């Protein structure tokens, strides 16, 4: 299933116009700029001042546009991205709480949300120190997964909103432990 994610408000009318042209009801996602910022080397790629994503106000405006077209059920995914290699689990927890509250409010306003994309950020403990420095993380994969589920579930339960299907973009954590060294053979012996 392909879900186009709106990262700039000007993309929404393009998606809606094209969907109308080809006669489909699109499944749409929106990337929210959270107030929470990531940590570590790539922290500027997330947060409210990020060049990617929509403010909460823009998302609400987008939902109103969808409602005007009778398409609020088409908004099915909320996405956020803190950055890459988030070293401190507290940052992740804060962002999860904020994003979950946006998810709940959009659901209450009539969005057909089913998915929460928690983006990237799952870090790798490169130096083995288990600290919140750039080359490490102060959490395990299991702790990260538990926190994602717990925080989304708790906020949704408090608001009596169905739990979302969780999507993650944890590319670094998937590939970091697998590497390959490629080089030219300079000579052969024997």
Question: Where are the language model's segments positioned?
Answer:
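Active-site-proximal beta-alpha core segment in soluble small-molecule metabolic enzymes
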Residues: 1-117, 124, 140-143
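C-terminal active-site-proximal or functional interface alpha/beta core segments in diverse enzymes
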Residues: 84-190
């Amino acid at each position: 299933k392909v879900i186009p994610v709106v990262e700039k408000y000007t993309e929404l009318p393009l998606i809606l116009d094209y969907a109308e042209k080809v006669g489909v009801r699109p499944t749409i996602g929106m990337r929210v700029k959270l107030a929470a910022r990531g940590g570590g080397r790539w922290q500027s790629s997330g947060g409210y001042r990020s060049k990617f994503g929509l403010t909460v106000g823009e998302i609400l405006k987008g939902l109103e546009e969808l409602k005007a077209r009778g398409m609020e059920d088409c908004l099915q995914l909320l996405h956020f991205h803190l950055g890459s290699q988030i070293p401190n689990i507290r940052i992740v927890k804060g962002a999860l709480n904020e994003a979950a509250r946006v998810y709940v409010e959009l659901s209450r306003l009539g969005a057909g949300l089913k998915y929460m994309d928690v983006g990237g950020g799952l870090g790798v403990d490169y130096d083995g120190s288990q600290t919140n420095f750039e080359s490490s993380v102060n959490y395990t994969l299991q702790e990260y997964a538990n926190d994602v589920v717990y925080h989304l579930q708790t906020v949704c339960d408090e608001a009596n909103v169905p739990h979302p299907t969780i999507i993650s973009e944890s590319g670094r954590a998937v590939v970091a432990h697998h590497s390959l060294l490629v080089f030219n053979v300079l000579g052969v012996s024997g």
